[in-house]
Amino acid sequence: MDNNQISDALSRTSLNAMLQDALDILEADDGKSFEEKRDAVISQLKQKNDSELARLLAERAIADKAGAGTKDAFWKCGRIIRVNNNVVLRPVKPCDHDGFLLIQQENSMIRSMVKEEAFCDMVWKEHNEEKSLMLSIENMGSYIGYCGIKDTSQDLWEIAIELKRDWTKHGIGYPALSTMLNAIKSRLGVTEFRVRIDPTNYPSQKLFERLGAIPNGLSELWLHDQRALEKFEEENLHLIDDRIVEVAKKFQVEPRKLLSHVLEYRLSWAGKGEADGQV
């Protein structure tokens, strides 16, 4: 074993020890709040001279706090936002849990992972994070999906929307998103957004283009290593069809690039319809 290997092994051991210490603090049944435990973890990391990791955790804590302020500012203007006579937008509730996980299960890309309890807990927790501004979509009192912003700590907010499979192609996406964007504009003053869409998700592309989104390049999603991306593209060239070619022309890229990337859109929202359907 050379010096580099020894150094790597020591680094891994040190990191594992720090992570275990952090877990011990977070999982301790000592009656302390999550915020108190989080501050204790950051303090301990600083004592261990791991300033970079402490900085990242501190930034996460700040993002959570800022996100909580954004979420409070949004919902204090009204917790029910009417889309039409049957559909409303409201804050996420614990009773949405099963419906939300059903939507994740219907997503073929992560269907196998939804069987894992830890994964389900993780995605549900992310859905409820302070920095995420998620609005549940109800139709006549029944949960049918959600729309919202993934991370309000980012400079450019990314829009998300998912509906239960039985409720797709029912004309709900456009009015729900329009209503949400109107509310965000009137309540928070935010009008610039990003959208990322799978190259083969043609209905979503059509929906956001109808809302005014314009192509803004490509984004990496699962893979980031350039050689791995090229290898993946090479192995899947047979998947390129006429529709992929048309999308590639619209985004002015080689069709093969759509095999390893997602579409990036930019949306500047001027407002349509009612300013805010709050109740």
Report residues per predicted region.
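Short amphipathic alpha-helical heptad-repeat segments
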Residues: 11-22, 30, 34
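Active-site rim helix/loop that mediates acceptor-substrate recognition in acyltransferases
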Residues: 113-133
